[in-house]
Amino acid sequence: MDELNINFDKYKNIRRTMGRELIDLNPIQRGGELPVESKKAIYEYWDGYSVCDYCGGRLDKVETPPICEYLHDVSKFLGMDFTRPTHGARESKFIVMHSVCNEGDFVVLDGNAHYTSFVALERAKLNSEIVEHDGYPTFRVNPEKYAEVIDNLEDKNKPIGLILLTHVDGNYGNLADAEKVGKIAKQKGYPFLLNCAYSVGRLPVNGKKLNADFLAISGHKSMASASPCGLVSIKGEYADKVFRTSKTHPVKEIEMLGCTSRGAPLISLMASFSHVAERVKNWDNEVKKTRFVVDELEKIGFNQLGIKPKQHDLIKFETPILDEIAQKDKRRGYFFYEELKKRGIGGIKRGTTKEIKMSVYGLSWEQVRYVVDNIKEIVEQGNNI
């Protein structure tokens, strides 16, 4: 065999400094940091099919490690009936759409929906109808608009298969009124899917109390899990559709393609369960930290977008003051990223100064104040250029 001209050494020592050497402000990562117990558990199960040592043919039935018990317990935690592991919220959404809807049906969803909601419904050969938000600067989704969009589709005799709401969106961190949208869906007679990628695992969520029929959950985004991992949690009345089994291989659930996320990601999700169940009790304190950041940074020229006051940790700021400094600094738009990095802070997108997204979820008050003080210092120094 001819010798390959490949430098294999560069793949042997891959390492990452974010999170270990830098305070990570990236909202997509704040809820996914693993506690020590999860890192230890991964060590035991990082080999390929190690969770399948005692598998009887289906992942959700495995007793050692206690996957079966975990799925039962996490269903109670979520206020739902049945749960399965997935590779993430996007896969959870597709599973629901593909099993509950008919080809050509319409999915009614909010204007803040994540791109994966649209990709999932397109993959399932469905159509979308958007409930528009109220625009700048709040981008709020009005639950009553769902009723209007549904009525309009019904007047046109368009088939509706599913109502979808983004519980917390990834752009502005708006916490939507899921209970009201779920009530409208129930009154209209349509199943309701709640995308909880940024909520379950960060704040308390009870699916049935929110009138949800399905929850799409991200483990790596909000449940302190390695990636890729998520959950789909459902009401019992939909179990026969969502968890239907194969004609040729009766033990296998079709929508799961037999088995979904397994190995290290699933083990980390399970090992983090007690940590996650405990931290959601501190949600009020997380909101206080977030509002503190907003209050302090708006004093120096930042402007928080989205609903005020903040009800979620994800913050999006307009930052004209940073853009003004960038015009004077020889590093241009990279100055803010570089100044933060010097101070042991990361997670802000490189080269961005007009708008930034950040989160201090899970940080101590000391760390939060450190972040705020250093951003103030950077702006003060920039104003003196």
Swiss-Prot record:
Q: What is the lineage of its organism?
A: Archaea, Methanobacteriati, Methanobacteriota, Methanomada group, Methanococci
- Which keywords annotate this record? Protein biosynthesis, Pyridoxal phosphate, Transferase
- So what family is this one in? Belongs to the SepCysS family.
Name of the protein: O-phospho-L-seryl-tRNA:Cys-tRNA synthase
Q: What is its EC number?
A: 2.5.1.73
Q: Name one GO biological process term.
A: translation
Concerning InterPro entries, the annotation shows:
PyrdxlP-dep_Trfase, PyrdxlP-dep_Trfase_major, PyrdxlP-dep_Trfase_small, Sep_Cys-tRNA_synth_arc, SepSecS/SepCysS
Query: Top-level EC class, please?
Result: transferase
State a single Pfam family of this protein: SepSecS
- Reactions catalysed: O-phospho-L-seryl-tRNA(Cys) + hydrogen sulfide + H(+) = L-cysteinyl-tRNA(Cys) + phosphate
Which positions carry N6-(pyridoxal phosphate)lysine?
K221
Amino acids binding pyridoxal 5'-phosphate = A89, R90, N195, S218, G219, H220
Quaternary form? Homodimer. Interacts with SepRS.
What's the cofactor? pyridoxal 5'-phosphate
Q: Which organism is it from?
A: Methanococcus aeolicus (strain ATCC BAA-1280 / DSM 17508 / OCM 812 / Nankai-3)
Instruction: Give the protein's biological function.
Output: Converts O-phospho-L-seryl-tRNA(Cys) (Sep-tRNA(Cys)) to L-cysteinyl-tRNA(Cys) (Cys-tRNA(Cys)).
GO molecular function list: Sep-tRNA:Cys-tRNA synthase activity
Gene3D superfamilies named in the record: Aspartate Aminotransferase, domain 1, Type I PLP-dependent aspartate aminotransferase-like (Major domain)
